[in-house]
Amino acid sequence: MGGREATMVLMDENGKRCDGRTVDEPRRIMIKAGGLKNADGSSYIEFGDNKILVGVFGPRDVHPKHMSDTDTGILRVRYHMEPFSVGERKNPAPSRREIEISKVIKEALEPAVMLEKFPRTAVDVFIEVLQADGGTRCAALTAASVALADAGIPMRDMVAAIAAGKVADTVILDVNNEEDQAGQADMPIGYMPNLEKITLLQLDGVLTPEEYKKCIQVGVDGCKLVYELQKKALNDKYFGNKGD
């Protein structure tokens, strides 16, 4: 990121990106609610070539007890990339990046979850990245929201997430791995559409003030598309495609 020299054509003269998409076209997204019988809630997402499984457990007692909060519940998130999720086998031990993304996702989810409804307890979110292809934090955040809803955790809204970015001096939606590595900017955004609130906003790269505003708008519009797929996943599980 940050304007590194590209080794491939990221955008051709017709405005087509390296994977054939237009500037405002997301990758293929498939979300499924449920699937893990031993979890209180779960979900599976394919976001481009990302494949991520999420399990939610709780609310349940906090151990050790002194870590509990008498006024509110605790949300705990673990983001983990399987050793086979990337081309070169990854060390199975938690990396600094995994710890950082766990914290980012936790903080993006907290405004959505009504933790005050279950004091002295914890909700654990386990995120397993089975295959990675750029944008895993957005895909994981999206899937985690569905899994929390599937678990019946009280929520103000679901958080939908996608990344906007800048490639070949053009603002784009849904940055893939090649664009992330060789593009000019990457902006992951998490958004609660019903409340019109952003819960995640990061920027890697350099943007002008105008590009910054455009990236946010493109990202928010993309989150609204993702949100419809989140709702569909829950509707498909609980209502069998009946209704909206």
Swiss-Prot record:
Taken from the UniProt record, the cysteine pairs bridged by disulfide bonds within this chain are: none
Family matches, as SUPFAM superfamilies: Ribonuclease PH domain 2-like, Ribosomal protein S5 domain 2-like
What do the Gene Ontology cellular component annotations say? cytoplasmic exosome (RNase complex)
The text of the family note is: Belongs to the RNase PH family. Rrp41 subfamily.
Q: Name one GO molecular function term.
A: RNA binding
Q: Which organism is it from?
A: Nitrosopumilus maritimus (strain SCM1)
Which UniProt keywords are given for this protein, alphabetically ordered?
Cytoplasm, Exonuclease, Exosome, Hydrolase, Nuclease
Function as written in the Swiss-Prot or TrEMBL entry: Catalytic component of the exosome, which is a complex involved in RNA degradation. Has 3'->5' exoribonuclease activity. Can also synthesize heteromeric RNA-tails.
Describe the protein's quaternary organization and the partners it interacts with: Component of the archaeal exosome complex. Forms a hexameric ring-like arrangement composed of 3 Rrp41-Rrp42 heterodimers. The hexameric ring associates with a trimer of Rrp4 and/or Csl4 subunits.
| Record-listed E.C. numbers | 3.1.13.-
- Localization per record: Cytoplasm
Q: Name one GO biological process term.
A: gene expression
The name this protein carries in UniProt is: Exosome complex component Rrp41
